[in-house]
């Protein structure tokens, strides 16, 4: 389960490696799942990347370690919790997506992110 103060991996090549979730915009919920937009701050970053340490970004959750029940009755879970950083227009900050992403991301309207991903599970 992902909640405020959780550390997440970054699944794109924006330059950030680890981020900390600091909020859930427009929601009073405690937990988030795949496809939700969250506010994060960068905790670890590469020196030459677009994302800098300490900056605040919006991000979409693409993988969660907690099992997720689908409408057909099947369950899916991943090895880590991962996000993709978004720019101010809601587009991916990076140009490549690393690792698989859940199908629910495409269903939530992030079709550009789903098309960049090598594998949609």
UniProtKB/Swiss-Prot annotation:
GO terms for molecular function: large ribosomal subunit rRNA binding; structural constituent of ribosome. Gene3D superfamilies: Ribosomal protein L14. GO terms for cellular component: cytosolic large ribosomal subunit. InterPro entries: Ribosomal_uL14, Ribosomal_uL14_bac-type, Ribosomal_uL14_sf. Keywords: Ribonucleoprotein, Ribosomal protein, RNA-binding, rRNA-binding. One of its GO terms (biological process) is translation. It holds the Pfam family Ribosomal_L14. Part of the 50S ribosomal subunit. Forms a cluster with proteins L3 and L19. In the 70S ribosome, L14 and L19 interact and together make contacts with the 16S rRNA in bridges B5 and B8. Belongs to the universal ribosomal protein uL14 family. Binds to 23S rRNA. Forms part of two intersubunit bridges in the 70S ribosome. PANTHER family: 50S/60S RIBOSOMAL PROTEIN L14/L23, LARGE RIBOSOMAL SUBUNIT PROTEIN UL14M. This is Large ribosomal subunit protein uL14.
